[in-house]
Amino acid sequence: MVLVKICGVVRVEDAVLLDGVADYIGFIVEPTSPRSVKPEALRSLRDAVIKSRPVLVTATIPPKEAVDIAAKNEIPVVQYHSTLAPKDFDYAETRGVTLAPVAVYKPGIELKQLVEELLKTPHEYVLVDADKKSQERYEGGLKIPLTLLAEVAPLGRVALAGGITPENAQLIARLNPYMIDVASGVEASPGVKDMNKVKALLKAVGRL
């Protein structure tokens, strides 16, 4: 069964609706994102999540600070979109937080090799995502070539992201990854989730 993470949740009412529907729910604390929430807003969002596993997502906050914010708000996972050092994993463990490192796809990168290296870390999962600045589109509107996703999907606890929508999710589900990660693909507007799209996504990956 493919797990599902819905990311970029900014409204408590969406967190309530998604709780127990998505396996993971992501809260972005990142000034560069249109779906960013302030750290002080995390507690109310986190408290709305009882059945799903909450995740703090960031890229530019220093790893130690991100882990501290997560621990303070009882968020067990930090998905980190920049470089992590061994000491960061060690520190996260002392705070009861697990890191989810990210392999960012750019044309020409040895994606499989990068994912294999990240899988050697004490990870919650390894996310494969596209460069946020990239405008490239591949099969079904995906931001990463399907052939490359097929190479990394069976390697371990690998989550796939990058342009996934209810319309193309079946392409990803056929690869049987550990998880798919979707934000804008199930939205009415940035940060506002559309439950009809969420249900369509779940149906596309065989969860409904």
From Swiss-Prot:
Keywords: Amino-acid biosynthesis, Aromatic amino acid biosynthesis, Isomerase, Tryptophan biosynthesis. InterPro entries: Aldolase_TIM, PRAI_dom, RibuloseP-bd_barrel, TrpF_fam. CDD domains: PRAI. One of its GO terms (molecular function) is phosphoribosylanthranilate isomerase activity. It is an enzyme of class 5 (isomerase). Its EC number is 5.3.1.24. It catalyses: N-(5-phospho-beta-D-ribosyl)anthranilate = 1-(2-carboxyphenylamino)-1-deoxy-D-ribulose 5-phosphate. GO terms for biological process: L-tryptophan biosynthetic process. Pathway: Amino-acid biosynthesis; L-tryptophan biosynthesis; L-tryptophan from chorismate: step 3/5. It comes from the Archaea. Pfam families: PRAI. PANTHER family: N-(5'-PHOSPHORIBOSYL)ANTHRANILATE ISOMERASE. Belongs to the TrpF family. This is N-(5'-phosphoribosyl)anthranilate isomerase.
